[in-house]
Amino acid sequence: MSIFLTESDRVIVQGMTGSEGRKHTRRMLCAGTKVVAGVNPRKAGATVVFDVAPLGPGAEALGVRPGTVEVPVHGAVAEAGRATGAAVSAIFVPPAFAREAIIEAVDAGMRLIVVITEGIPVADAVYAHAYAAERGARIIGPNCPGVISPTRSNVGITPPDITGSGPVGLVSKSGTLTYQLMHELRDLGFTTCVGIGGDPVVGTSHIDALAAFEADPDTELVVMIGEIGGDAEERAAAYIRSSMTKPVVAYVAGFTAPEGRTMGHAGAIVSGSSGTARAKKAALEAAGAHVGRTPSETAALARDAHRKVVGAAERA
């Protein structure tokens, strides 16, 4: 199985006609994602033609063949949803328009909204997340790589050809570290990889993903990537202690970060002793998680945890 996303989900792309939207829509199509429409009020009625070829494991099984795919452009999300039956949206619009794009997707009945856009004002993000939560829609992001279930579907910008399917669940604040751990653990493979984003306000938390992986029968262990700043990792540690039965392996980026300086993401900032990588590592280890000091060490810990899971299953 997978979490949040299945191979049958139909996807629309808000901002598909822009350069980034067009580039990543093509990659999603090449991975086998069912992208069925784009949305741009100024280009309603147009059709965008994509050159596609299978990319990543499972693409051919999902029906991807070398050739072209035509994707229609609608003027509104509601119109696109009615015409295609889509319930998932990927958002590639500029930051100033992101709040209204999210609200439009929620009002149109999108159950999953993946917001790739970086630089959305915090007040806009707070409003949009509250609006979606009140209406039962899930936002992943903003400022995230999206969500991929290898050999099933891929919504966002995650490269589909760096890993395959397997028993590991991955939740991460960092896009590049998501890709690195996916590559380092390609021998095991993943049920789903969720990039939640590194902004101060995100729609899906570590805890949300941990709970979904705990409930997923095909996920045998979880790799969690955090970073300095805030208390998301400490809250995740409390959840791991109280609710996780599956092993959790973690990595916290930022052990050498200087105090008071934002490091990469808007939310990655240390203030005094609060939000340090060492404090987060200690909290996670106290909760029973195994924490690596580097991505490669984290991958090794994950392999060891998986061997123990397999050994326990064989002895049962």
Model-inferred region functions:
Residues 1-316:
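Catalytic-core regions of core metabolic enzymes
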